Structures are given as structure tokens and as C-alpha cells.
């Protein structure tokens, strides 16, 4: 599987409300989301479990995915519309976001080693 296919599979899993931690390397450093910072593989896994537990009805629309692979490393950037419902606060969220990050090949799979998601105007 290519790095690009892994990213698209991650988007599909996010839409479907499936577990996401397996997409990250065991030694993943950090995942930045809108308003959050998850550090280390345990922190990333816990944050993603909580996200899956407390959200539903995801829309993930990729508008400009660009991926570069070189050897066992890959990096990417994308403009993504993300929308979801928070089932605890009963709020709907809808954002145009920018994604970037790095992946490392492990055997036949790619795993994220870092990811950054931001919305224009984030502070």
C-alpha cells in the first residue's frame, strides 16, 4: 500500500467512526488537532479513542492531497473539510482545515509519525 492510500484509508476510518490509533507508529511523536495536542503513542491513542467515543457523523472531504515518498519516509499536505457532531455537547462542527505530517514505512504498511491539523485563524 502507498502512503497516499494509507492517508485515504485514515480518512475513510475517520468517516466511519472506526478506531484510528493503529494508523500511528508505536513511536509516534505528536498529533496536533484543532485545539488539541496529543504526545507520544499512548497519548495519541487515548485522544483518538476519546474522539471516536464522543463524536459521530463525520464528513471528511480531501481537496488537495499531495504526497511525496522517498525510501521509507513520506510526507503529505492536504486541504480538508471536516465536519462532525459532538455527542456530549450536542454541537455541530464544520471546518476547512489544513493537514500535514510524516509517515514511515513499516514492512508493507505506512504509519503516521507526526500529524498537524489546523484551521485558518487558529491561535
Predicted ranges, named:
Residues 82-93, 121:
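Short, cysteine-centered beta-strand-loop-beta hairpins and adjacent loop/turn segments enriched
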Residues 1-23, 53:
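Short acidic-aromatic low-complexity motifs
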Residues 21-69:
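A solvent-exposed, acidic/Ser-Thr-rich amphipathic alpha-helical stretch
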Residues 55-59, 70-74, 91-95:
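A generic structural micro-feature
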Residues 75, 96-123:
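Short beta-strand edge/turn micro-motifs at domain boundaries
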Residues 44, 48, 62-67, 80-82, ...:
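Hydrophobic/aromatic beta-strand elements that line small-molecule binding cavities or substrate pockets
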Residues 60-62, 77, 112:
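Hydrophobic residues on conserved beta-strands that form the core of alpha/beta folds
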Amino acid at each position: 500500500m502507498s502512503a497516499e492510500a494509507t492517508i485515504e484509508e485514515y480518512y475513510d476510518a475517520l468517516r466511519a467512526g472506526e478506531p484510528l490509533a493503529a494508523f500511528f507508529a508505536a513511536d509516534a511523536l505528536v498529533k496536533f488537532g484543532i485545539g488539541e495536542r496529543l504526545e507520544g503513542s499512548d497519548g495519541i491513542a487515548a485522544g483518538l479513542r476519546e474522539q471516536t467515543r464522543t463524536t459521530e457523523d463525520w464528513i471528511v472531504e480531501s481537496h488537495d492531497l499531495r504526497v511525496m515518498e522517498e525510501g521509507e519516509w513520506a510526507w503529505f499536505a492536504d486541504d480538508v473539510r471536516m465536519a462532525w457532531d459532538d455527542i456530549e455537547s450536542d454541537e455541530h462542527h464544520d471546518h476547512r482545515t489544513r493537514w500535514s505530517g510524516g509517515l514511515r514505512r513499516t514492512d508493507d504498511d505506512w504509519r503516521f509519525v507526526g500529524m498537524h491539523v489546523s484551521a485558518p485563524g487558529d491561535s
